[in-house]
Amino acid sequence: MVSALKCSLAVAVMISLACSAYAIKCYQCESLTMPKCGLKFEADETLLLDCSRIGPPRYLQNFFPLRNATGCMKKTLESVAGHPQIVRSCYFGDINNIQAGCQSDPSMPFVKQLGCDVCTKDECNGSSSLAPIAGAILLFFGVARLLA
């Protein structure tokens, strides 16, 4: 009975850590409505979004239905007026082939996309993406050692 309880506890710890390890947080903003989101970015906690809580944009849902975000992105767009606009958001798609995930929104035909940068770290500027996984593995072995 005790070993079954220990095993259940270890599995529960691993599941909760695995879920948190794959959730990525990205900044979500547009420089058109929020100047601090522009080229001179001013980090702000209120702009952070847990990407596991949202799905891909409508125009990408045919390509990535019910898929979790795989990274963060920063798109540089040129509006009709010719001014550069920065859009920061969660990225949905293959990190190794960003062409599909970075495609332009077809509902905005007059906006030209100048660039799309993709990264796989929280907030695109901080902790290594392997750090949460490595921590989860170490914690699992620590719990297993205690329960043994």
UniProtKB/Swiss-Prot annotation:
Recorded phenotype for the gene knockout or disruption: Enhanced rolling escape behavior in response to nociception (perception of pain).
Membrane-spanning residues: 128-148
Signal peptide coordinates: 1-23
Gene Ontology BP annotations: negative regulation of sensory perception of pain; regulation of synaptic transmission, cholinergic; sleep
GO cellular component: membrane; neuron projection membrane; neuronal cell body membrane; perikaryon; plasma membrane; side of membrane
Record carries keyword Lipoprotein: yes
Residues listed as glycosylation sites in the UniProt record: 68, 125
Keyword Disulfide bond: yes
Disulfide bond sites: 26-72, 29-37, 51-90, 102-116, 119-124
Entry keyword set: Cell membrane, Cell projection, Disulfide bond, Glycoprotein, GPI-anchor, Lipoprotein, Membrane, Signal, Transmembrane, Transmembrane helix
Subcellular location: Cell membrane; Membrane; Perikaryon; Cell projection, Neuron projection
Protein's membrane topology: Lipid-anchor; GPI-anchor
Covalent lipidation (GPI-anchor amidated asparagine), chain numbering: 125
PANTHER family in the record: ATILLA, ISOFORM B-RELATED-RELATED (PTHR33562), BOUDIN-RELATED (PTHR33562:SF18)
Protein's job: Necessary for the maintenance of persistent fluctuating activities and suppression of acute evoked activities in abdominal leucokinin-producing (ABLK) neurons to negatively regulate neuron excitability involved in nociceptive (perception of pain) behavioral responses.
Stated name of the protein: UPAR/Ly6 domain-containing protein bero
Gene: bero
